[in-house]
UniProtKB/Swiss-Prot annotation:
It holds the Pfam family Chi-conotoxin. Expressed by the venom duct. It comes from Conus pulicarius (Flea-bitten cone). Belongs to the conotoxin T superfamily. InterPro entries: T-conotoxin. This is Conotoxin Pu5.4.
């Protein structure tokens, strides 16, 4: 009998939590996956330029 009030309170708390993000996304919002993809791409480019740029300047993407 003591568990019934606790169970009811838990049900009420679960029902009151929003299941979807209530805030509207703006064009400035960027997903975290996109941020990680950009970071990976940047690190890959940096790694590639480090291996080729000391020998040959023309292989660098910026010059």
């Amino acid at each position: 009998m003591r568990c019934v009030p606790v169970f009811v309170i838990l049900l009420l708390l679960i029902a009151s939590t929003p299941s979807v993000d209530a805030t509207q996304k703006t064009k400035d919002d960027m997903s975290l996956a996109s941020f990680h993809d950009n970071a990976k791409r940047f690190l890959q480019t940096l790694r590639n330029t480090r291996s080729c740029c000391p020998e040959e300047i023309t292989c660098c993407p910026w010059g």
